[in-house]
Amino acid sequence: MAATAAASVAAISPLPGASLPRPVSARVPLLPRASPPTWRLSVGSARARSTRCLAAAGGGGLAPEMRATLDKVVGSHKVVLFMKGTKDFPQCGFSHTVVQILRSLDVPFETLDVLANEALRQGLKEYSSWPTFPQLYIDGEFFGGCDITVDAYKSGELQETLEKAMLS
């Protein structure tokens, strides 16, 4: 057995004058760490006070063409869900959950697949100051992501908001 161990060590030992390759961590320089996002709570409804937080706007800014496009999409439908996949074939559990909630409330809604367009996906993150998907818009305003939608559904706030939107 000792001979086997010696043979395996010899098999991985470098040739005389050669050195073992450096580990990847020694070859790849570390990227500078980005500062963590700053979160601020918005005030307003009970939903906003208890669960909704918005990322503080970072630098860069949204291209005017993208802002105009998103304004048009969000403003032209009472309920819009930006999601991963489609309402008939959601590509993530969070998107599926919000679709199921909206269907259970028998609300007409439009969906846009953010996986089909990288520029749309990145633009929406800036537009809403919300980093994840799905993103639900009701009556032209950002309502929230999956967790906020679920909480609002359980409390009855989502139903109230949707009823008001459908009547306006």
From Swiss-Prot:
Keywords: 2Fe-2S, Chloroplast, Iron, Iron-sulfur, Metal-binding, Plastid, Redox-active center, Transit peptide
Positions contributing to glutathione binding: K84, R121, F133, C146, D147
UniProt entry tagged with the keyword Cell membrane: no
Molecular function as annotated in GO: 2 iron, 2 sulfur cluster binding; metal ion binding
Residue ranges crossing the lipid bilayer per the database entry: none
Organism: Oryza sativa subsp. japonica (Rice)
Record flagged with keyword Iron: yes
InterPro entries the UniProt entry points to: Glutaredoxin (IPR002109), GRX_PICOT-like (IPR033658), Monothiol_GRX-rel (IPR004480), Thioredoxin-like_sf (IPR036249)
Compartments where located: Plastid, Chloroplast
Gene that produces this protein: GRXS7
Annotated ranges, domain Glutaredoxin: 67-168
UniProt xrefs under SUPFAM superfamilies: Thioredoxin-like (SSF52833)
Protein function: May only reduce GSH-thiol disulfides, but not protein disulfides.
GO CC entries: chloroplast
Family: Belongs to the glutaredoxin family. CGFS subfamily.
Principal place of residence: plastid
Residues annotated to bind [2Fe-2S] cluster: C92
Domain of life: Eukaryota
Transit peptide, residue positions per record: 1-54
Protein name: Monothiol glutaredoxin-S7, chloroplastic
